[in-house]
Structure formats: structure tokens, C-alpha cells
């Protein structure tokens, strides 16, 4: 919402749930630090870049500590540094027990996942499980699968 500061936008789900202001601030501090948005929390959406808006949206999703996070193209508006930071944050969150379902067209983003599902014509076409694969090996498997899918058209 353009009439709310980034901080107020992030707080919105907590306000609607009846949290006290001090509780909201305590939740926000570590998330804002991890997403590198502490210095812009008092700015309005029209005053920040697309990537900064994206990181504020991620903070709003994380502040409620959900068991399931739905992320639709979360790295789409981010530069490579911010993308890497967000993917590491998602990995840490996932390691703490939260499930993340991410829709992405980015092979780089997908190569960080534990499981990648390829959907074609509304059905699961192929799956890759990470297992012990490195990020580079996972990237290669995803790229090979995308090549296979493209050659079948």
C-alpha cells in the first residue's frame, strides 16, 4: 500500500492479528537486518527500488512465522547480490522447519531447492530431488531437463 511506509506494510498482518507494537518491532529487527532493509523502513513504496519493495514483501511474508511460505518469482526484481542473499535466507528458514514452495523461471533460484518439479500442461512432467547434489550439479540437472523439454516441442 503506497500510503503506508515499508515498516507499516510489513506490520500489517501483525496489526490485523492484534500484536503489540513492541512485539512487532522485535520480530522485524532480525528480518530487516537479514534482508538489508533496516535503513529504508521509514520510506514509502514509491521512494524505493523494485528490489527493495520485493525484499519488504518478503519481510511481510516472514514476520508472521508461517509454516508454509508461498513464493511466486521471489527473485524476479532482485539483482544478483540480493538474489543470493534471499536464497540463503530461504535456505536458513527451510532448515529451521518452514516449508517454502517457490514458483520460478530462474534456473539459479531453482538450483537451491531440495526438490524441483517441472509442470507441463498443468501436470507434473518431471521431478529432481537434490539429495547430495551440489548447487552446480543441481543447476546442470535442471538445465538438462529444460533442454529436454524444449527439444520435445
Please give the residue ranges for each predicted region.
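A short, proline-enriched helix->beta-strand linker immediately N-terminal to the Walker B motif
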Residues: 63-67
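Hydrophobic anchor residue at the start of the ABC signature
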Residues: 58
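Catalytic Walker B motif of ABC-type/P-loop ATPase nucleotide-binding domains
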Residues: 69-72
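Short coil-to-helix segment of the ABC ATPase nucleotide-binding domain corresponding to the Q-loop/switch region
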Residues: 4-12
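Conserved ABC ATPase signature
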Residues: 44-48, 52
